[in-house]
Regions:
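Short, extreme N-terminal segment that most often corresponds to the first beta-strand
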Residues: 1-24
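A general secondary-structure signal for short beta-strands and their flanking turns/coil
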Residues: 1-4, 45-49, 92-94
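Beta-strand secondary-structure signal
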Residues: 4-6, 51-53, 98
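Residues that cap or initiate secondary-structure elements
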Residues: 11-16, 58-60, 105
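Extended Gly/Ser/Thr-rich low-complexity repeat segments
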Residues: 21-25, 60-85, 95
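Short secondary-structure junctions
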Residues: 28-36, 90-96
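Short, intrinsically disordered low-complexity segments
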Residues: 31-76
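Short acidic DE-rich linear segments
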Residues: 96-105
Length: 105
């Protein structure tokens, strides 16, 4: 499943480094490459918004690698659980961003 996720942050220059480092680590753990695409950031009212496409191969590999943690995450739908897991995973790596699932297919 491909996820379209909106990233929100008030400090993108700092968070971008942490975010990309964390996702690159996830790619290595899941034995995938080029698993996500970041669009150009847009700034409004002190916030920066970035649309991300999380490709199916990285998503499915993460679902397998972290199945128990995702299952325990908050949310009633699988998409919510996955997004909440990813937020917590990023927070544990000092990346303080917000994620909003825009679409999944």
């Amino acid at each position: 499943m491909t996820y379209y996720i909106q990233i929100s942050t008030i400090d993108w220059p700092k968070d971008q480094v942490l975010f990309e480092d964390t996702l690159n680590t996830l790619e290595k753990l899941c034995d995938t490459q080029n698993g996500y695409i970041l669009n150009e950031p847009v700034s409004k009212f002190g916030w920066t918004f970035i649309d991300m496409i999380l490709k199916a191969d990285l998503h499915m590999s993460m679902e397998q690698e972290f199945a128990e943690q995702i299952k325990k995450s908050k949310g009633s739908k699988p998409e919510e659980k996955f997004t909440n897991f990813l937020v917590k995973y990023l927070e544990n790596n000092n990346c303080k961003i917000k994620l909003k699932l825009m679409q999944s297919n």
